[in-house]
Amino acid sequence: MQTAKKFKPHAAPAKRLTLSVIIPCYNEADTIEPMLERVEEIGLADEIVIVDDGSTDGTRDTLREIEAEARPNVHIFYHEHNQGKGAALVTGFSHASCEIFLIQDADMEYDPRDYPILLKPLQEGIAKVVYGSRFLGGPRKAMNFWNMIANKILTLTTNILYNAIISDMETGYKVFRSDVVRDMVIHAHSFDFEPEFTAKVLKQGIRIYEVPISYNGREWSEGKKITWTDGFVALWTLIKYRFVD
């Protein structure tokens, strides 16, 4: 008589993978320091890389003050003029040195308290890329209707073009092994980073792992920067990278 095999849980990697949190910012004078404090309070980042993308509202003054405090794991870089979120992220990637990269927007829409659930699949070795989804049941502030519709269209387009099943392509919480992006040529300068990165990850044959996150979206009156024209650019980006590299 055969005995039932005992279930063996998935073995975690022998050591914890190190984490770089990359924060692109543009005109976030009111939020950059509180966001940095939130990231530091979580205590999971081995280094924090902030890239100021040509801010003109006093953000740089705040960052200079942070630099003067000589926080050893905080590294700040500056663009002389505004180039866009994608360009700021490329700069951040080039200066980050850890095994996992986590993108953290500076606008307080995404909560660093979600880091443990975002990092778990990577630390357990069951994923190379993790997206935090705003549509998997986590607490969230109601989104603008047209923003939600645009997101659904872009996500559906992604799934059709790249044979994927994801729920939130445009999420700001993208976390991944650093080797995923090391040899990736990113052309995006603005919010088209999201579709370009997603397209190139899926074309590598990497399956995206999703986890539920919280979300506290801003209104345009509060400084939200993405516009309806970015949606058309994102759609074109998805179509373009389906056929070219």
Please describe what each predicted stretch is:
Residues 18-20, 47, 196:
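Cell-envelope/extracellular polymer assembly enzymes that use nucleotide-activated donors
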